[in-house]
From Swiss-Prot:
GO terms for molecular function: glutaminase activity; imidazoleglycerol-phosphate synthase activity; lyase activity. The keyword Nucleus does not apply. It comes from the Bacteria. The active site is at residues 77, 178, 180. The gene is hisH. The lineage of its organism: Bacteria, Pseudomonadati, Pseudomonadota, Gammaproteobacteria, Enterobacterales. This is Imidazole glycerol phosphate synthase subunit HisH. Heterodimer of HisH and HisF.
Length: 196
């Protein structure tokens, strides 16, 4: 199977690459349209700010390429947020617009931001991405912005208030947490995605 990690220039790709390799796949890191469009599975990781990430997406001519993908795509952390419409970061950043939902800064409710560490995730019953993962399994988060619960939410988490922990629209999936740093539950989620 042809597994590709999209080279957005704004992610530490080694941990994602290693996590995929543990399932027996050899992922390529690429931004070449011919490689990306022929992938069976595509990963969209991201760390840092939405502004820097979208600058890289545009500079590397990935905006239309990502939106043209028809194979399963998994956005991770900031990669999930990039699927949204607009981020509140940096006075507002236009995102890919695949999911018609904004990404506001989290309200702290007296809790520290960023939301960092392990938290429980509650998936919708029956979604293939969470098959075999128990309700309330712990995943690892590091973020200060979060997509609200919306019609495309497939899993929720609570940090002062509910937010989207995972999302799906058509072939595009996103997870706010880091599956590659989430132990057995994260490994199972990656396996589920790779075997779709």
């Amino acid at each position: 199977m042809n597994v590709v990690i999209l080279d957005t220039g704004c992610a530490n790709l080694n941990s994602v690459k290693s996590a995929i390799a543990r399932h027996g796949y050899e992922p390529k890191v690429s931004r070449d349209p011919d490689v990306v469009l022929l992938a069976d599975k595509l990963f969209l990781p991201g760390v840092g700010t939405a502004q820097a990430a979208m600058d890289q997406v545009r500079e590397r001519e990935l905006f239309d390429l990502i939106k043209a993908c028809t194979q399963p795509v998994l956005g991770i952390c900031l990669g999930m947020q990039l699927l949204g419409r607009r981020s509140e970061e940096s006075n507002g950043v236009d995102l890919l617009g695949i999911i018609d939902e904004d990404v506001p800064k989290m309200t702290d409710f007296g809790l520290p931001l960023p939301h960092m560490g392990w938290n429980r995730v509650y998936p919708q019953a029956g979604n293939r991405l969470f098959q075999g993962i128990e309700d309330g399994a712990y995943f690892y988060f590091v973020h200060s912005y979060a997509m609200p619960v919306n019609p495309w939410t497939i899993a929720q988490c609570n940090y002062g208030e509910p937010f989207t922990a995972a999302v799906q629209k058509d072939n595009f999936y996103g997870v706010q947490f880091h599956p590659e740093r989430s132990g057995a539950a994260g490994a199972k989620l990656l396996k589920n995605f790779l075997e779709m």
